[in-house]
Design a protein with these regions (language model features):
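Conserved small/polar residues in nucleotide/adenosyl-binding loops
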Residues: 137-138
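Walker A/P-loop
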Residues: 15
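P-loop (Walker A) phosphate-binding loop of NTP-binding proteins
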Residues: 9
Length: 138
């Protein structure tokens, strides 16, 4: 199985490339940002640690984490960001690695991982290629 990592700036066309690879080559596409939402859902790995860090005020009526409230706290108190990242990023990486392993077992030929902090989180360690997309204005 080949794994391609994709990263790049805002508006560089990442979503377009992901959709193309998924449609044209039947690629399994996994986006770190979406995984971040999954691991913070009720009953998932990061749910309770995030509540422990930010307090019960971040729980909405439907029991999900109020991401806006979390971002407000992080904006006002930047020290919380490194703590939050220490909870979320390792869980996202584990989830992605598990998903890639499952796809390999199912015989998938191509997987694509997209992440904003691709290099910072060392995702290149489990990718065969890394594509950095950028948009050049002329």
């Amino acid at each position: 199985m080949k794994t391609i990592g994709i990263t790049g700036g805002v508006g560089a066309g990442k979503s377009t490339v992901l959709a193309y690879l998924e449609e044209k080559y039947n690629a399994f596409v996994i986006q770190a940002d979406e995984v971040g939402h999954i691991v913070m859902a009720p009953g998932q790995e990061c749910y309770q640690p995030v509540i422990d860090l930010f307090g019960k005020d971040v729980i909405k009526n439907d029991k999900t984490i109020d991401r806006k409230r979390v971002s407000d706290v992080v904006f006002e108190q930047p020290d919380f960001l490194s703590c939050l990242n220490g909870i979320i990023h390792p869980a996202v990486k584990r989830y992605i690695l598990k998903s890639l392993e499952e796809q390999k077992k199912e015989g998938r030929k191509l997987c694509v991982v997209e992440a904003a902090l691709f290099l910072e989180e060392h995702y290149q360690e489990f990718c065969d290629e890394v594509w950095y997309l950028s948009l050049i204005h002329i």
